[in-house]
Amino acid sequence: MWLSFLRPRDRFSLAELRYLTDQLRKIQIVNEANKDLVIEALRSIAEILTYGDQHDPLFFEFFMEKQVMGEFVRILRVSKTVTVSVQLLQTMSIMIQNLKSEQAIYYLFSNEYVNYLITYTFDFQHEELLSYYISFLRAVSGKLNKHTISLLLKTENDVVVSFPLYVEGIQFAFHEENMIRTAVRALTLNVYHVGDESVNDYVVSPPHTEYFSKLISFFQKQCMDLSAMVLNTLKSPSPDSGGKLFSAVDGIEDTLYYFSDVISAGIPDIGRLITDHILQHLTLPLLLPSLCSEAVNDISVDPVTSLYLLSCILRIVKIKDLANMTAATLFCPVKAFISSSLVKPNSSLAPEGLTYVNGHPDKGVTEEANQQCSSTAAGMSDDGNSHLCSEDTPKSIFNNSHMTFRETLLQYISEGDDVQAQGSLFVLATLLQTKELEESMLDAFGILPQRKQHKKLLLQSLVGEDTGEEQLFSPRNGSMRDGLSSELDWYLRRLEEQFGVCCSLPGAARCPRVHRHQVVDTLVTLLCRENISAETLWDGGWLLRQLLPYSEAEFNRKHLKMLNVSYEKCKNSLTREIKGIWPDLLIRVLLDEWRKCKRVIEAPSPQKEPKSVLLQLDRSSSNDNSVSESSFTAGERMCEVVKVFVLLHQLQIFSLGRSLPEQPPIYPPADRSETSRATRAGLDVSVPKPGTELKLVDAVPCRIAFERGKERDFSFLALSSGESGWIVLADPDNGIVRVTAPLAGCKPRIDEKHPRWLHLRIRPSTLPLLDPTKRGVYEKLKSKGLVDGRWILAFRDDESCHSAYSMVAGEIDLQCSEVERRLRPLFDLERNQLEDQ
């Protein structure tokens, strides 16, 4: 009998559940003496019920019959310790998450116990308790559906009057702890995606709509913080600037993706609320004015951040009204948004002399502008003599009384710095890729691809619309005037009615053909700029490619001439690189960049995300530490030149109506001459590695000390094979190679005071930036400002030194000549054009 009494109970048994329940009922008050017993009982009950849910329904029947949930609530009331509250919330979370039986979930939710726990006044000064409470709320929300959600509501006349889960949850929506914010967002999404109409009405009715305005305010603060980080990075970059920017960008995009998830629930009023709040509290008062203004009292954001945010909002938040109204604002004058109490115009970009009468442009200005569409169209002759962005036009053409945000974006591209140009290109690319945007808005902006124009006009002609047929077969066409005017005007009226933004478009603003010419002109101007990075030029090349083919009136001989001039300059720069420090890697880089550029330009969407414009700020600021004479710097310059050349070359091919080949047209490597020095030396491998035996034909004896006080005798050779070349120091007795270095970039120089000394500059054999896996190492090397190695070789006499110098110079010439020979077909683009014509 005693053995039976001492035998332990089965942990997962009904008897154990009964025993634990009895233990809880005996507890009259929870204190330090019995809290461990209570915690263990609560934890064990959760485990037993989870086990029973999968194996024996009698477990949960007992749980219901004995009203164990009531015991949980009673224990919470009589508890004086936080740890018991934590365990109770954890027990409830485990049960709700793991119970698969619908009956079990219905029972838990059908009583008021869950709502009681939700509304219970916990002491949230304990962070651990708050975390478990939020986890409990999230667990409850995870079980919501159209049947269970009604069990947590209070209604009157079929109208929801109380929803504690939602109300209590959103109180912590803006907690400083990111994990808590994330959990609350998951809770709200679970509520929105249930699809219960009465609940939808509840969450979009006052005062619950304040959640969305607070959400936009929270997002606005994120934007301001990001702007401050961007400005600090530009002014005084630090080692952790990149990490801070990355974290801030992630936070902003997480919020925008949350907006997107909320909208995907399909609650129309929520989409409207988010649209109105974003426009009213962010886009109109901050982002747009910041494009042409500088901050006053730190309440604005910098232009680069504004460009990034505009792109991100359009790319992530898929709301038709938001996309089209944002696009419509770009046609409005800058003064329509700038309040003198908030921001002041930026002298370099803001328009001058724009006058308003009761919020509208001066009539004289409008009447003058109404004549621009026809006069501009007439001015676009076949030779491209347009007054817009022509070579004789001053760069301040957009700084006039008619300047709009659209023109500001174009001005950033044609005149701004690298980051401003890239940010503006992202905005244009995002507009082009935004499916929610009306095609007529793209046409008005000047970025609707011609294939889409023809498609729409063809549809109009097929359904019998005369204007469509006339425009389709008219060489001077360029506008879908009726659709454009009605849709653009409709969104402009909404801006005035809802937000008080008055914008009356002059005649020129209604001429898409003028705008298309402006965009093309701006992009061609960008591609002709020499102070812009290749990365940004590739972005401009992608956008230009999307707009091909053009009509002759938009992409004309002037543009071709500009591109040809820029191409010739770039070709000359590339030719100089053949004589530079890295000719042995030039063809490899060219082949690689050709494939990359082809992939980028022919891609249906940009290969980079808008955040790249911010994340590169830290890297660009650190470039100031690089040594100007370093081979690393020269390698970067060579890669930049190759990238720009490849882009311009491929655009030239596109302009001829030809498709891009997979590989650039270059000659194959030439066979090594039997009379070459490398052949005479017996070099039968691609690289003379240490240990290789060579014939010391033409070798010149020399001495060099790689360590202080330790001079060694070597036989000196300079060898080239194709585009490769090496400086070789071999053992004078047996010709065994001991040391090698790249021939290219060695810059031989005879010492002026010691004519027996030969100075050589020794660069690395490879360029780390070409290997993505070594990008981190490369950045560290650059930041340390490392310089190239230096060799000083001492020869027996002046004649030997001159002989070695001549050997190096001659082999370098052979090496560079081979690179130039292989690239010759690539440089014969003009001859190829004539053949095509």
From Swiss-Prot:
It comes from Arabidopsis thaliana. Residues 42-192 form the FPL domain. Disruption phenotype: Abnormal pale brown color of seed coat (testa) due to low flavonoid accumulation levels. One of its GO terms (biological process) is vesicle-mediated transport. The keyword Membrane applies. It is found in: Golgi apparatus membrane. It comes from the Eukaryota. Residues 368-378 have a biased composition (Polar residues). Residues 366-386 are annotated as: Disordered. One of its GO terms (cellular component) is Golgi membrane. Belongs to the CLEC16A/gop-1 family. This is Protein TRANSPARENT TESTA 9. Involved in membrane trafficking and vacuole development through membrane fusion at the vacuole. Required for membrane trafficking machinery and accumulation of flavonoids in the seed coat. Pfam families: CLEC16A_C, FPL. It is a peripheral membrane protein. The gene is TT9.
